[in-house]
Amino acid sequence: MNIEIREYRNEDRDEWMRVHAIILSLSHAWNYTIQERPEYEGYTSTRLVAVALENGQSRIVGLTDVQYDNTTGELCFLKDSRGGYVLELGRLPEYKGLGIGKMLIDAAAEDAAGKGFHRLEYWTQDRTAQRFYRRLKMKEIGRHYRFRIKPTPEISALLMQDRVGAEYVYCACLPDEWPLVKQKYDIIQKHPLEPHLCVGFEIRF
């Protein structure tokens, strides 16, 4: 079996969506499902797929998408230069151990450099992905908690002034603030809305 990294094509859409859905179901990296393939209108982007070639047949088994800053700090956390924010990275579980993730990261970096960008940011709340990035010696650049709270009476009253109801409020805070936040607010703990620690990593090239 050979693995090839190539650019995404429009005819890949249905297969890409299927692979993305499988990866999403096994990861905590995403907060929502999607029914349309992201296009990144108005932005420079990288869209790559990993294709397995077996017995004369080919199938998409991994993917990565990068969206690039139009202006410094527009998308990326670090503000020293324009970079790429990696929105998608994953591979099918049955292809574990073949180095596909590293191949996609390397190919994305090469494509980014060809477009004039020299750094990529990888943010994830999935612990397996965090361990993977650490094994690759990526530099950690930040962390924060992502969580949902039940609206306080004050928040509910403010929104109801415009006849807006809120089932929950999606929030973020720094780790140092997390203990106080847990004491002060009614945080939703039940899956799939439970809190996660999101960690950011960076590569430069």
Model-derived features: positions:
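Conserved acetyl-CoA-binding loop-helix of GNAT-fold acetyltransferases
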Residues: 91, 97-110, 135
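Conserved catalytic-core motifs of GNAT/GCN5-like acyltransferases
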Residues: 123, 139-192, 197
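Conserved acetyl-CoA binding element of GNAT-fold acetyltransferases
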Residues: 75-93, 123
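Conserved GNAT acetyl-CoA-binding A-motif
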Residues: 112-125
